[in-house]
Structure formats: structure tokens, C-alpha cells
């Protein structure tokens, strides 16, 4: 009884969904299972335990409600469209365990088209923790961030996000040496995508 009142108000002013519903405290934890932990592409359903675990962390440490959504699709455009179509239900989107380089494309496009926060945990969560560790290590060793050289062993989503945050924190671009499974990423090396090439050194 009475539910029609907020329905009518939200239809006139969609922002009122934050006042009259759980939207503002509800996050979608979304994966296609293409990069599950260190296990690789095991499919969307296999990612469900990780997504449910993330939902538990949201509730336990931030009292944020969340729903895990596993998308059985590896096409970035299809994933983007799916998330766009359900985004109105949520106050935020947490992308999880989506392989690079698709994860970069998906996150960037969603940030452009949605009016809610979009966060790719594998990139930014890892980068925040790693940069905090770097800052503390530099403080203990009495070194300046602008003088240190850093080797990043790996060139996936997490590694690239870490390197980007290192640069934003003051590490010089030329002082970051990134390696993938084929070795150091350097200028002139063949068969590297646009995302890796941003870290190519002389």
C-alpha cells in the first residue's frame, strides 16, 4: 500500500530514486570470468565465488549492499551494452576479473556514458594498495619518488594501473620498466597493443 507515491515521484524526478529506494547503497559486482584471479579465462559461472566474496567484503567493511552479475560474453561492446541496460538499478558498478585489454575499453566507455561511479577493482584497488606500499617504503628508506627506478613484472590490467598511479604520484615515466611474458616493453618492439605501448622505454 502506498507504493504508487514514490513511483510517481521518481517518474517525475529520477534523482529521487536515491531517496526512496536502495539504489544509492547498491553496487553491481560484474565479471565475465575472462581473468579470474591468477587462473585465467574459466568462464562467467566459475567467477561467481569471487564475485560473491567481493559482495561479502562490501557488506562487511562498508555496509554496502551488492549483487553479483556474471555475464556470459567476451565481446566488450556486448558487455558495455548489458551493463548500460541494467545500470539504472545501481548506485555504482564494480568490474572484476575482466581480461586486458578489454577491461580498459569497457571501463572507459562506461565512465563516459553512465552517471554513476564505475570502478575496475583489479586495476585501481591493486594500484592504490601498491602505491601506498611504495610511498611507505620510500619514507622508510629516505628516498625521493622522483629518483627511484621501478620494475613492474607483468603488463596486465593491474600492472598498468599500478604504473599509472606511480607516475601520478611522481615516478618519472622513463624510470618505470615494464615487463610482460616476452620481456621488457620497449619502443620499436613488435606486437604490443596500444595500452602496453604507453609504457615502452628507449
Stretches found by the model and what they are:
Residues 37, 42-62, 120, 128-202:
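Glycine-rich phosphate/diphosphate-binding loop of Rossmann-like nucleotide-binding domains
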Residues 123:
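Acidic, His- and aromatic-enriched active-site or binding-groove loops in soluble protein domains
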Residues 1-118:
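N-terminal ligand-binding/catalytic initiation module
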